[in-house]
UniProtKB/Swiss-Prot annotation:
NCBIfam families given in the database record: PRK00099.1-1
Protein's recorded name: Large ribosomal subunit protein uL10
Database matches in InterPro entries: Ribosomal_uL10 (IPR001790), Ribosomal_uL10-like_sf (IPR043141), Ribosomal_uL10_bac (IPR022973), Ribosomal_uL10_bac_type (IPR047865), Ribosomal_uL10_CS_bac (IPR002363)
Top-level taxon: Bacteria
HAMAP family associated with the record: Ribosomal_uL10
Described purpose of this protein according to its UniProt entry: Forms part of the ribosomal stalk, playing a central role in the interaction of the ribosome with GTP-bound translation factors.
């Protein structure tokens, strides 16, 4: 690959990494072409890009991006899964692929500017989808004012009940 081509690859990868919500670094040593094609297909179906990269080019492309945290991990054979939407999707697909093919190893991940080790990437894969998390948060936030209104309305309701009981006693007497 000549210098101009390398510069083009670095520029394209840099742009992708800047837009990425998550980047997962994997070691693909031992995967056959068919297995790699299956993995790429599964990732592409969810709009996640999977690219084999030279470590030096990845090091250059990741400057001033969230994936810069991955630079110390760049050793051996590396490929990067770049997700643009829900950050858990690349981790979920790779973890699911790992159930049937243990040759693919998760090296690390970058979520924003935070470096995730392989265990943290696996934990990210266990998270529910973003929409579900937002729905749970909204439900929790909605429950707080509802509970507060119930508690606050309980005091006047009890006071009115006491007044009604006093009035009934006076009417009976």
């Amino acid at each position: 690959m000549n210098r101009a081509k390398k510069e083009q690859v670095v520029a394209e990868l840099h742009e992708k990494l800047q837009r990425a919500s998550a980047a997962i670094l994997t070691d693909f040593k031992g995967l056959t072409v068919a297995e790699m094609t299956d993995l790429r297909g599964a990732l592409a179906a969810e709009k996640v890009e999977y690219q084999v990269v030279k470590n030096t080019l990845m090091r250059l492309a990741s400057k001033d991006t969230g994936a810069e945290a991955l630079v110390p991990i760049l050793k051996g054979t590396c490929a990067v899964a770049i997700g643009y939407g829900d950050p858990s999707i690349p981790a979920k697909i790779i973890k699911k692929f790992n159930k049937t093919n243990e040759k693919l190893a998760i090296k690390a991940g970058a979520l924003g500017i935070r470096l995730l080790n392989s265990d943290q990437v696996a934990a990210l894969a266990e998270l529910p989808p973003r929409e579900e998390l937002l729905a749970k948060l909204l439900g929790t936030l909605n429950a707080l004012p509802t509970g507060l209104v119930t508690v606050l309305s309980g005091v006047p309701r009890a006071f009115v009940g006491v007044l009604a009981a006093i009035q009934r006693k006076r009417e009976e007497a």
